[in-house]
């Protein structure tokens, strides 16, 4: 005895089989893609950039001032956020696909370096940091600024 299956159920079964096939194909592709990335052992490229490493050192240096000196809360906040944004914008800019996007992030990053120097200059004028501390940080910032300028210029060329 043969049971008659209503047409709507047949369509649902066909769609389910089609979805399972697509799902299986996607799973195979996804597994293959993961396997390929695992075999390459990719690292985030920005972590290899000397400017990123130097920015982290600069951020740590400014962080020690924030932690060791008696700054007003707004000074602590502004210096911490600005020096941290240097590190973050280098990373984020490096992840952009177009040259103009990367360039814009590095321009913003360089502006943050300038902002940090101005904060440090005010702290020096208010005798919160010494001339030696200021010069040390200013030298680090100058190096960051020069590297970023070269990166910006390179990305600006056709």
Ranges and model annotations:
Residues 3-158:
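Amphipathic alpha-helical assembly/interaction segments
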């Amino acid at each position: 005895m043969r049971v008659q299956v209503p047409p709507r159920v047949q369509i649902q079964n066909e769609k389910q089989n089609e979805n399972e096939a697509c799902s299986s194909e996607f799973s195979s592709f996804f597994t293959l893609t993961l396997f390929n990335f695992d075999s390459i052992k990719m690292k985030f490229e920005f972590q290899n950039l000397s400017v990123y490493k130097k920015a982290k050192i600069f951020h740590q240096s400014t962080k020690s001032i924030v932690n060791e000196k008696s700054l007003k809360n707004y000074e602590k906040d502004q210096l911490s956020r600005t020096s941290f944004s240097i590190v973050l914008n280098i990373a984020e800019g490096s992840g952009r696909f177009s040259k103009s996007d990367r360039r814009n992030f590095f321009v913003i990053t360089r502006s943050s370096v300038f902002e940090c120097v101005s904060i440090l200059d005010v702290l020096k004028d208010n005798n919160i940091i010494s001339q030696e501390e200021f010069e040390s940080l200013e030298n680090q910032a100058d190096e960051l600024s020069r590297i970023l300028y070269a990166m910006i210029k390179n990305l600006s060329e056709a």
